[in-house]
Amino acid sequence: MSIDSLTNLLNCAKTRNNYVVGFVVQGWEDASSFVRAADETETDIILQSGPGLRKNMPLELIYAMFEKLSGETNIKIVPHLDHGENYDICKKALDIGFTSIMYDGSKLSFKENLNQSLKIYELTQKYNACLEVELGFLAIMI
């Protein structure tokens, strides 16, 4: 069908009283399997491009893979950059066509992470893309 935005997928799922599933992609084989299974169950999906995949495949090729798979199915696919470590990788993903970004600045100080998160938020607004941020961690004392 097509590449879509996370906002649209979530709105459609809510209207249909349905769900959206996200899968971390490691390569062609699992990406195509995820899409095939989603197509069979008529479930729109998020294909997540994490750091592991990006070590072995350029972002442009990852997006091209997601785009090709979207043309071979009846479902909608959200291309998602997972754990983008800095502004540049997030911008590059948006320039290529990713519609959803997860910025992970958790290794920075809280203040620096928050400032970077706000800059990336402003960037995603220009692209009409969704943003998820990792601001830190939760600790539980037992």
Report residues per predicted region.
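Hydrophobic faces of well-ordered beta-strands that scaffold small-molecule active sites
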Residues: 19-25, 45-49, 77-83, 101-103, ...
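N-terminal amphipathic alpha-helix/helix-capping segment at the start of soluble metabolic enzymes
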Residues: 1-24
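N-terminal glycine-rich phosphate/pyrophosphate-binding loops that anchor nucleotide-derived ligands
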Residues: 22-38
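Active-site cofactor/substrate anionic-group-binding motifs, chiefly glycine-
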Residues: 41-94
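Expand to "…catalyze enediolate/carbanion chemistry for C-C bond making/breaking, isomerization
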Residues: 95, 139
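Active-site-adjacent beta->alpha loops and helix N-cap segments on the catalytic face
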Residues: 3, 32, 55-63, 83-92, ...
